[in-house]
Swiss-Prot record:
Stated role: This enzyme is involved in nucleotide metabolism: it produces dUMP, the immediate precursor of thymidine nucleotides and it decreases the intracellular concentration of dUTP so that uracil cannot be incorporated into DNA.
CDD domains according to UniProt: trimeric_dUTPase
GN (gene name): dut
Name the record gives this protein: Deoxyuridine 5'-triphosphate nucleotidohydrolase
Protein EC: 3.6.1.23
Annotated catalysed reactions: dUTP + H2O = dUMP + diphosphate + H(+)
Enzyme class: hydrolase
Co-factor(s): Mg(2+)
Keywords: Hydrolase, Magnesium, Metal-binding, Nucleotide metabolism
Keyword Hydrolase carried by entry: yes
Pathway the protein takes part in: Pyrimidine metabolism; dUMP biosynthesis; dUMP from dCTP (dUTP route): step 2/2
GO terms for MF: dUTP diphosphatase activity; magnesium ion binding
Family under the similarity heading: Belongs to the dUTPase family.
Lineage: superkingdom: Bacteria
Length: 152
């Protein structure tokens, strides 16, 4: 199923030097977001930087949201993760997409112009309405949390 999402190009290199975000395979859940900067960036250990992607989106449909997730190889191999862990883009947001990158590693890391640094994934949204209760119906788990079910 394909859902149209409005995308605005903010940097003229998108679509010429660098491709629009796209799914790499028919089974891909996310589209790669790239560092669309004027120069390479060096992220020092412990440093967090905000990196432009060169695009803005407007999801518009309140039953959808977009999330920005890390690329697994950057985190595992180089210690580069999202500074906010997950970026949430509400359906009514219309601004530029930025990626917060945090170098949790011990070495400086260089991001070149156009490097793929995160993934954009669209997810369904359900808006809840709270129903106030005095007690919950008993469940098997109850209030057990934070390791309650064990590791084995």
């Amino acid at each position: 199923m394909k859902t149209p999402i409005e995308l605005k190009i903010l940097d003229s290199r998108i679509g010429t030097e660098f491709p629009l975000p796209a799914y790499a395979t028919p089974g891909s859940a996310g589209m790669d977001l790239r560092a669309i900067t004027d120069t390479q960036l060096v992220i020092q250990p412990g440093e967090t930087v905000l990196i432009p992607t060169g695009i803005a989106i407007h999801v518009a449909d309140p039953s959808l949201a977009a999330i920005i997730l890390p690329r697994s190889g950057l985190g595992h191999k180089h210690g580069i993760v999202l500074g906010n862990l997950v970026g949430l883009i509400d359906s009514d947001y219309q601004g530029p997409l930025m990626v917060s990158c945090w170098n949790r590693g011990s070495e400086p890391f260089t991001i070149e112009i156009g490097d793929r640094l995160a993934q954009l994934v669209f997810v369904p949204v359900v808006q809840a309405e709270f129903k106030l209760v005095d007690e919950f119906n008993q469940s098997d788990r109850g209030a057990g949390g934070f390791g309650h079910s064990g590791t084995k």
